[in-house]
């Protein structure tokens, strides 16, 4: 979606908000942002955090956000990126275990040196 919007000149006027239960750690968040997400709502993590014993739901939520942001900053610093704007849409990941045809079709601009599974596989 990010690449398509950029191609037709609409990306700067559009925000991509991903609401997902699939974020389990800061790496998942980093991948979504690197592939173009403007914001991410990891609703399943927030739901689990509110049930954390010995802290209020608000404290648990704040701790979760701090942890995700800290992890994202660590990942960005390892990649040599200092702003979220510079990281968004950067595609600074490599696909492992997927054929170049699959990667080119589903993850444009993503590197894949090893190759692997095809659609029929």
Model-based region annotation:
Residues 29, 55-121:
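Flexible, glycine-rich loop/tail regions that form catalytic "lids" or insertion modules at the edges
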Residues 1-16, 20-74, 111:
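Catalytic or ion-translocation cores adjacent to nucleophile or general acid/base/metal-coordination motifs
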């Amino acid at each position: 979606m990010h690449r398509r919007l950029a191609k037709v000149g609409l990306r700067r006027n559009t925000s991509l908000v991903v609401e997902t239960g699939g974020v389990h750690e800061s790496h998942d968040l980093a991948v979504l942002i690197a592939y173009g997400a403007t914001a991410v709502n990891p609703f399943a993590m927030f739901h689990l955090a509110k049930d954390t014993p010995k802290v209020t739901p608000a404290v648990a939520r704040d701790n979760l956000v701090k942890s995700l942001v800290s992890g994202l900053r660590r990942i960005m610093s390892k990649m040599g990126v200092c702003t979220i704007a510079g990281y968004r849409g950067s595609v600074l990941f490599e696909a492992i275990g997927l054929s170049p045809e699959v990667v080119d079709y589903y993850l444009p601009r993503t590197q894949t040196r090893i190759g692997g599974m095809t659609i029929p596989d």
